[in-house]
């Protein structure tokens, strides 16, 4: 029997990796005529009212718009050896931009739970997010960082 990946948003936790189509309405910048793109996101927090999550994107390459020193320092490497069931190659977790996504929308778009950050990566990413000046205190507080 094939293990279902359909996501139960009530049980999602920090560090979970979800595969979901995102579009411009979600804050994604789309190129080449795409209406949406399937993306891996990592949950890094929840809004106080509990209806939305704060998420970071996993990218196979660092986007050209993130090449300044400040934004390059916000790219966290995810090694394929730690995520063989999820990633096909070493990738980058973009810690410079938090996407707020409603739990309902992730469910409606058939988001799939693919796994979770390994504890070491989760701790380092959350520590970075707590200490970075890229996000103001209000943003950090909104997602419980």
Language model segments and positions:
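Mixed-charge, Lys/Arg-rich low-complexity intrinsically disordered regions
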Residues: 1-12
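C-terminal terminal-subdomain/extension
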Residues: 71, 75-145
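Short acidic, S/G/P-rich loop/turn micro-motifs used as interaction or catalytic elements
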Residues: 25-26
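Compact nucleic-acid interaction/catalytic patches
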Residues: 29-38, 43-82
């Amino acid at each position: 029997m094939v293990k279902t990946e359909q996501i139960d948003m009530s049980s999602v936790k920090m560090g979970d990796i979800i595969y979901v189509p995102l579009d411009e309405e979600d804050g994604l910048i789309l190129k080449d005529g795409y209406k949406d793109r399937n993306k891996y996101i990592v949950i890094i927090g929840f809004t106080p009212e509990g209806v939305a999550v704060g998420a970071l994107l996993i990218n196979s390459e660092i986007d050209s718009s993130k090449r300044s020193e400040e934004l390059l320092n916000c790219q966290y490497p995810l090694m394929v050896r730690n995520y063989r069931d999820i990633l096909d190659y070493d990738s980058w977790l973009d810690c410079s931009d938090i996407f707020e996504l409603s739990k309902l929308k992730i469910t409606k778009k058939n988001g799939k739970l693919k796994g979770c950050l390994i504890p070491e990566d989760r701790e380092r990413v959350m520590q970075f997010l707590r200490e970075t000046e890229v996000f103001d205190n209000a943003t950090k507080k909104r997602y419980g960082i």
